[in-house]
Curated annotation (Swiss-Prot):
A Gene Ontology cellular-component term: cytoplasm
Cited InterPro entries: MEIOC (IPR027963)
Gene from which this protein is expressed: Meioc
UniProt GO BP: chromosome organization involved in meiotic cell cycle; double-strand break repair; female meiosis I; germline cell cycle switching, mitotic to meiotic cell cycle; male meiosis I; metaphase chromosome alignment; mRNA stabilization; oocyte development
Coiled-coil regions listed in the entry: none
Principal location listed in the UniProt entry: cytoplasm
Organism of derivation: Mus musculus
One Pfam family recorded for the sequence: MEIOC
Name of the protein in its database record: Meiosis-specific coiled-coil domain-containing protein MEIOC
Subunit architecture: Interacts with YTHDC2; binds transcripts that regulate the mitotic cell cycle inhibiting progression into metaphase, thereby allowing meiotic prophase to proceed normally. Interacts with RBM46.
Disruption phenotype: Normal growth but mice are fully infertile with barely detectable ovaries and testes at adulthood. Complete absence of follicles in the ovaries and spermatozoon in the seminiferous tubules and epidymides. In testis, approximately 60% of the tubules contain spermatocytes arrested early in meiosis prophase I, the rest contains only spermatogonia. Testes completely lack postmeiotic germ cells, and are depleted for meiotic germ cells. In some individuals, germ cells does not progress past preleptotene, while in others, germ cells advanced to the zygotene stage of meiotic prophase.
Composition-biased stretches (Polar residues): 949-965
């Protein structure tokens, strides 16, 4: 409840001088404190319960205790009613507000709880001073409660709001620092700690009372520390508390392909890598009689590829594909939490199944889910049962089987959905024909490429057509087979590959435009002028210098340049096919050799959310698909692969739901040495090469298959963001671009890395921001107070200048060091100014004012001590190799101390305002206050201009400062 405008009891003061508390009466202060002492010391959940009661009291309109005492978020609370139901609990009765008996920071080893008699003496002293200075009743009501100011769950920012990009990983209304006894050193811990911090970080549902009093006296100090940091290990600013309840893990990951096999999973599966190595591939090859020889590191290749063996090849690769496809990141987001439940979920992820083989070899497809934007089916040969028996761990992420929705007759009519493994041409297709479907998983052309390509190898290119359909269903499409799945293929774009004089044509097909989908006209056609002057020049250069691009293997055996035919198909696809490409957003290159021991995601999952490779295109635009180049005869093999990578390797993007927001998460992409568009320049920047996407597709995880475990070259590894910043000041801007101009492309096209922080580090930065806000507000209010006193006491020198020694900053200070020095300086100035006020009013100020300032100084000393401990312990651990958990404990202790300093700074602001109201003469006119406000505003504006000029003149220091805490 806000203060009514007709209130005339409060003293006049400048507008905006104090945004904090202003009391009206203090008659009930003693009655309030008796119950408040039992309530304000509660920890997290109890405080949350209190805040809920507070909100209900405000809505019911009960009589306020503080009519003029406005908190920073302009709320007022009736505390007389809220404390009644909670104080009846016997377990809360023994809890005493530790802030009332604040012990010096140097004596934390002693028991800080004092007998209740001291509380009575403090009340008697306050009552005596109230009788002496009874003319200012409202001020004494405020001053009397300064030391007992509640620790509400409200932000301590000066404006009452917190920055949107700052997320706290633990509540703002946690118990005080003196309650965190586990953070203190061993000899300084009190014996009777009564609150366990397990409730802060445990993900289990326990009642509030049980959370508060789960303390076990038999726990060792190290176990208590582990409780404090449970849940902090995998947190950062972007992903917090994304774990599911433990009951969902067994539902999400059930091994149903083999009823006798049950897999064991991590408690939080998306943090840990659940992939298991393929241990049985070599055994399968030995059983099939294939001669093998060593190929690179941890790879096996065959000496010859016979046509009957292609069935085995497809079987092994499909088992790879099924396994890692089913191991997608389902548990990262709550809407994907129950993939095998029967109810339809609009945001549910695609359901992966084991494809059954019908009588004539036609694969069976899963049922379409309502509004599911991707569905997959895999062609699984009948003899893969042997593969399942040999390698059961590859099928440990299977999902339940569903009924087919496409009939055998319908399927047989479409050549695009058939699988040709070289056994026979059932539907009139050649064994080496790449048949495009509506997705990017099809047309995977396997090519064998050695460390130095052997031009004499007649089987340089072998194609294995792996077909898996990715269907898109919008809101209006029924569960039956949509009409846009009737694809007509045309053999109208032959692209010859030159292989030592022998040409093997892989026919690329253009799918006909959709007519049945209700969204078929909503998406513009893809620009077909992908290869224009720049790309033609690149081709010419590649023809003239074939050796310039064929030697950049970097000991990866050419695996980075293995591309599938769908990259060339991606250059020629029109509207609908590229719509599906933007839906599936996955590119798969088959691993080098069909018996690769790595996962398919290591070489093929390319999801580059790169703002430099994506340009938004209005939906009304259309392009003429007649300008596609027909032939690439003159390109050598390696050069052709490089061109494919340059044109189609990094063109995947993501679009948000509704507003076309591109996901800003940076993905690790495979650096294809110097052949990709990062090092050679993107040929599509000004060529109108756009990806198309729908506004209706929800945003998915950017890492569906996890990070690659192969140590591929990356821009993070090639050029570190901080390594060269001191030697070359403009190196980072040239390599990564400037964050302030996100639309401009950096010189070398590298994406600026995003630094992630742990939970305690994130909390430290949040508390720093809060405390800086309070410090700035205290500084402004101190200057405003000086102006008010100078205006109302002409001829008197009012200044906060003092000779108090302030420690100097180190040569390379962090933000914590700067904050400590600033707080010490401001606290000394406030103390000096309060001494001037006492001389001006010829009487001492309230005792709580000086006590609050003393506690402010103590909180600063605590932060200083925690900072020293962090530095010393970090240096010791660096020499001894202690685990990082100890480092996190120091950071957490520092963040807690800064939080307490923030509270003390806010109370110092309250005391400063109270002292000013007690000091100002009662004859101060409104006109004089207006003049003072104007003068103060001019002073503040002048100082802000000076700060802006200083900050703009030294941008590099600002950038370097953000990397520290």
């Amino acid at each position: 409840m806000e203060v009514s405008g007709g209130d005339t009891c409060r003293p006049r003061h400048p507008q905006g001088l104090r945004e904090g508390p202003e009391p009206k009466v203090a008659a009930a202060a003693a009655a309030f404190r008796g119950s408040a002492n039992r309530c304000w010391n509660l920890s997290v959940d109890t405080s949350n319960r209190l805040s809920d009661v507070f909100n209900s009291m405000m809505l019911t309109g009960s009589a306020p205790f503080y009519d003029c005492y406005k908190s920073q978020n302009e709320d007022n609370v009736d505390l007389r009613q809220t404390c009644t139901p909670l104080s009846s609990s016997t377990e809360y009765a023994s809890s005493i507000d530790s802030s009332l008996f604040y012990a010096p920071w140097s004596t934390y080893g002693d028991d800080i709880k004092q007998p209740p008699s001291s509380q009575i003496s403090v009340k008697n002293r306050i009552q005596t001073e109230r009788n002496d200075y009874g003319s200012e009743t409202d001020l004494y009501g405020l001053v009397s409660n300064i030391l007992e100011e509640q620790d509400k769950s409200q932000p301590y920012f000066a404006e009452g709001t917190c920055s949107s990009n700052l997320k706290s990983v633990w509540p703002m209304n946690t118990s005080r620092f003196v309650d965190h006894h586990d953070l203190l050193t061993e000899p300084k811990r009190p014996v009777d700690t009564s609150i366990s911090q397990q409730a802060f970080y445990s993900g289990e549902s326990v009642s509030a009372v049980e959370k508060q009093y789960l303390h076990n006296s038999s726990l060792t100090p190290q176990q208590k520390i582990d409780e404090l940091y449970h849940g902090y290990t995998g947190l950062d600013l972007e992903e917090q508390w994304l774990y599911l309840s433990r009951s969902d893990h067994s539902n999400c990951y059930n091994s149903q392909a083999n009823d006798t096999v049950k897999a064991t999973f991590q408690e939080y599966p998306f943090v840990k890598n659940c992939f298991t190595p393929q241990t049985g591939l070599s055994d399968i090859m030995k059983e099939s009689g294939i001669d093998t020889y060593a190929y690179g590191r941890e790879k096996i290749c065959t000496k010859g590829l016979e046509t009957p063996l292609q069935h085995k090849r497809a079987e092994i690769f499909l088992s790879q594909f099924n396994r890692y496809n089913e191991n997608a990141d389902y548990c990262r987001y709550p809407e994907y939490a129950h993939p095998n439940k029967a109810k339809l979920n609009k945001c549910s992820n695609f359901s992966v199944q084991d494809g059954k083989k019908l009588a004539n070899g036609t694969p069976e497809t899963p049922t379409v889910e309502a509004d599911a934007y991707t569905k997959l089916f895999q062609v699984k040969p009948a003899n893969q049962k042997k593969m399942e028996e040999t390698i059961p761990d590859q099928q440990n992420f299977a999902f339940p089987k569903t009924t087919p929705h496409l009939t055998e007759k319908q399927f047989a009519k479409e050549a695009a959905f058939t699988a040709d493994f070289g056994l026979k041409s059932e539907y009139g297709l050649k064994p080496h024909t790449a048949c495009p479907t509506n997705n990017d998983f099809a047309n995977v052309s396997e090519k064998q490429q050695f460390a130095k390509p052997d031009p004499l190898n007649s089987e340089y290119f072998k194609s294995v057509n792996l077909f898996s359909n990715s269907a898109t269903s919008s809101g209006g499409i029924s569960l039956n087979r949509p009409t846009w799945m009737n694809v007509q293929t045309k053999n109208n774009l032959p692209i010859p590959y030159r292989n030592q004089g022998n040409l093997m044509k892989l026919n690329s097909h253009l799918s006909a435009a959709s007519k049945g989908s209700n969204h078929s006209s909503d998406f513009p056609q893809l620009s077909s002028t992908n290869l224009t002057s720049n790309s033609n020049l690149f081709q010419k250069y590649c023809q003239e210098n074939p050796s310039a691009f064929s030697s950049f293997d970097f000991s990866y055996n050419g695996a980075e340049r293995i591309q599938s035919v769908n990259h060339m198909e991606g250059l020629t696809k029109t509207g609908e096919d590229n719509l599906f490409e933007s839906v599936t957003e996955k590119k798969i290159k088959q691993p080098n050799g069909f018996c690769d021991s790595y996962s398919a995601s290591q070489y093929g999952i390319i999801e580059n959310v790169n703002k430099h490779n994506f340009q938004a295109k209005p939906q009304s635009g259309h392009y003429d698909p007649e300008d596609i180049p027909k032939h690439f005869d003159g390109l050598p093999q390696n050069t052709y692969q490089d061109l494919l990578e340059s044109q189609g390797h990094f063109n995947s993007h993501r679009q948000g739901s509704g507003d076309n927001n591109i996901n800003s998460r940076v993905n690790r992409t495979q650096a294809s040495c110097f052949s990709n568009n990062y090092m050679m320049g993107d040929l599509r920047h000004n060529q109108g090469f756009q990806q198309l996407g729908s506004n209706g597709f929800p945003l998915r995880s950017t890492h569906p298959f996890g990070h690659s475990v192969v140590p591929l070259l990356d821009s993070y590894d090639l050029f570190s963001y901080d390594d060269l910043s001191h030697l070359y000041p403009y190196f980072n801007d040239m390599m990564y671009g400037d964050n302030s101009f996100s639309g401009f492309v950096p010189t070398f096209g590298f994406q600026r890395p995003i630094k992630t922080r742990s939970g305690p580090a994130s909390e430290l930065h949040i508390r720093l921001e809060e405390c800086y806000e309070q410090w700035r507000a205290l500084e402004k209010e101190r200057k405003k107070t000086e102006l008010a006193l100078a205006k109302n006491y002409p001829g008197k020198k009012v200044s906060s200048t003092n000779n108090t020694p302030i420690p100097r900053l180190t040569s390379n200070p962090s933000r914590v060091d700067r904050l400590i020095v600033d707080e010490l300086r401001e606290q000394a100035r406030v103390v000096t100014l309060l001494g001037k006020m006492e001389r001006l009013r010829s009487s001492p100020l309230h005792a709580n004012i000086s006590t609050a300032l003393d506690r402010h100084l103590e909180s600063i000393h605590i932060v200083q001590s925690r900072r020293k401990d962090e530095i010393v312990n970090a240096s010791n651990r660096q020499r001894q190799g202690v685990p990082r958990c100890q480092d996190d404990r120091d950071v957490f202790a520092l963040a807690t101390a800064i939080k307490e300093m923030c509270v003390a700074t806010r109370k110092a602001r309250t005391t400063l305002w109270c002292a000013l109201q007690m000091t100002l003469p009662k004859t101060a006119s409104t006109a004089g206050q207006a003049d003072m406000e104007k003068a103060f505003q001019d002073l503040v504006n002048c100082e802000e201009k000076v700060h802006e000029s200083i900050n703009s003149s030294n941008p590099m220091n600002q950038r370097g400062e953000t990397s520290k805490h």
